[in-house]
Amino acid sequence: MTNIRKTHPLIKIINHSFIDLPAPSNISSWWNFGSLLGLCLMIQIITGLFLAMHYTSDTTTAFSSVTHICRDVNYGWLIRYMHANGASMFFICLFIHIGRGMYYGSYTFMETWNIGVILLFAIMATAFMGYVLPWGQMSFWGATVITNLLSAIPYIGTTLVEWIWGGFSVDKATLTRFFAFHFILPFIIAALVIVHLLFLHETGSNNPTGLNSNADKIPFHPYYTIKDLLGVFMLILFLMTLVLFFPDMLGDPDNYTPANPLNTPPHIKPEWYFLFAYAILRSIPNKLGGVLALILSILILAFLPFLHTSKQRSLMFRPITQVLYWMLVANLLILTWIGGQPVEHPFIIIGQLASISYFSIILILMPISGIIEDKLLKWSL
C-alpha cells in the first residue's frame, strides 16, 4: 500500500513543500528566517483575531477598548503585547531574510524575489495601519503625517488624501477603514506567502555558495525541520522575554496619551522598523522628492537583479562587495538612529549623508565592485 502522504491530493502538497522537499545540504542558519516569518505571521493573525474580538474602531472608544483588553480581558495584556512585540520580531526576521537574499544573490530568482518585495510593502502597510488603531497621540499624528505625504502628488494629491481620510482630517472614518484594512491584509499576505513558496519550489533553494546544488540534495524532513525548530524556540524565547520583561521597550510613551488633534507631540516618529525610511524621507527638503526617495528606498530591492554585474552569484567569495555590503548594513543602522532624532544639527547632515551613501552603495558602488572583482579574477571579457 502506498503512503497516504504521497497520494492524498491535499497532504501530497504539504509533503512536497515541507517533508520530501529536496533542499541543499549546506544552507546555513540564515535560511531559518523564512520559516520564522511564517511563525510570526501565524502569531500575528491569532493574537490579532483575539484582539479584534474586544477592540472597537470608534474614535471615542478605541483607546479605552485597548485599556479594557489590558485590564479586564483574561490574559488580554499578554495578547496585546505579543501582538505589538510580535510585529517587531516580524520585522527583525524580515530584515535578516532580505539581507540574506541580498548577500547570497537570491534575488536572481526573479519571481520569488518580486513577490517578496510586494510582501514587504504589504507588511509595512499592515504594520502602519495597526499602529494607528490604539488611537494614542503617536497613532493619530503618525497617521496624519504619513497619509498627508500623498498630498505631494501633483494635481490629485489633496483629493487623494481627503479620500483616504474619509473627511478633512484623520477621524472616525479613517480609523474604521484602517481597522478593516488591518484585518484583511494579513490574509492577503498569507496568500502571497503561498505564491512566494510556489515560485521558490519551482527553482529550489539557493545556498551560501550561490552554485547549483542539484548534485547534493537532502530531504527537508527531518534535517531542516529540526533545524527550524531550534530557530522557533529561540524566537519564542526572545519574544516572550520582550513581552514579559520589557513590553514597552520598543513602543512610544506618547501612545499612552489618548489622541488629541489640538496637541502635537514634540517629536512625531514611527515605530523603530520604519525609522530608516523616515530618515530618508526627512533628509530631502522637498516634499515630493522626499516621498519619492521614501518609496524608492524600498522599491530599490526590485532593481537588484538588474544591478548584478558579477559572474558570481553569492558574495561568499567576493571580499570587496562584502565590505560594501556591511557598510550598507551599518548605514541602515545609522539611518534608523537618525530617524528617531529631532530635526536639528548635526542630525540633519548625518541623515543626508547616510541617505546619499545608501543609494550610492546599491546603485553605483556594488555594481562597480562586481566588475572589478571579475577583472581581478580575469573573468571579464
From Swiss-Prot:
Residues engaged in binding a ubiquinone: 201
Membrane topology qualifier: Multi-pass membrane protein
Segments crossing the lipid bilayer: 33-53, 77-98, 113-133, 178-198, 226-246, 288-308, 320-340, 347-367
The keyword Electron transport appears for this protein: yes
One record GO biological process: mitochondrial electron transport, ubiquinol to cytochrome c
Cofactor section: heme b
GO CC field: mitochondrial inner membrane; respiratory chain complex III
InterPro entries to which the protein is assigned, alphabetical: Cyt_b/b6_C, Cyt_b/b6_C_sf, Cyt_b/b6_N, Cytb/b6-like_sf, Cytochrome_b, Cytochrome_b_C_euk/bac, Cytochrome_b_N_euk/bac, Di-haem_cyt_TM
Amino acids binding heme b b566: 97, 196
Residues noted as binding heme b b562 in the record, renumbered to the chain: 83, 182
Primary location group: mitochondrion
Keywords: Electron transport, Heme, Iron, Membrane, Metal-binding, Mitochondrion, Mitochondrion inner membrane, Respiratory chain, Transmembrane, Transmembrane helix, Transport, Ubiquinone
Cofactor comment text: Binds 2 heme b groups non-covalently.
GO molecular function, one term: metal ion binding
Subcellular location: Mitochondrion inner membrane
SUPFAM superfamilies to which the protein is assigned, alphabetical: a domain/subunit of cytochrome bc1 complex (Ubiquinol-cytochrome c reductase), Transmembrane di-heme cytochromes
Other information: Heme 1 (or BL or b562) is low-potential and absorbs at about 562 nm, and heme 2 (or BH or b566) is high-potential and absorbs at about 566 nm.
Function recorded in the entry: Component of the ubiquinol-cytochrome c reductase complex (complex III or cytochrome b-c1 complex) that is part of the mitochondrial respiratory chain. The b-c1 complex mediates electron transfer from ubiquinol to cytochrome c. Contributes to the generation of a proton gradient across the mitochondrial membrane that is then used for ATP synthesis.
Subunit structure: The cytochrome bc1 complex contains 11 subunits: 3 respiratory subunits (MT-CYB, CYC1 and UQCRFS1), 2 core proteins (UQCRC1 and UQCRC2) and 6 low-molecular weight proteins (UQCRH/QCR6, UQCRB/QCR7, UQCRQ/QCR8, UQCR10/QCR9, UQCR11/QCR10 and a cleavage product of UQCRFS1). This cytochrome bc1 complex then forms a dimer.
Recorded family membership: Belongs to the cytochrome b family.
Protein name: Cytochrome b
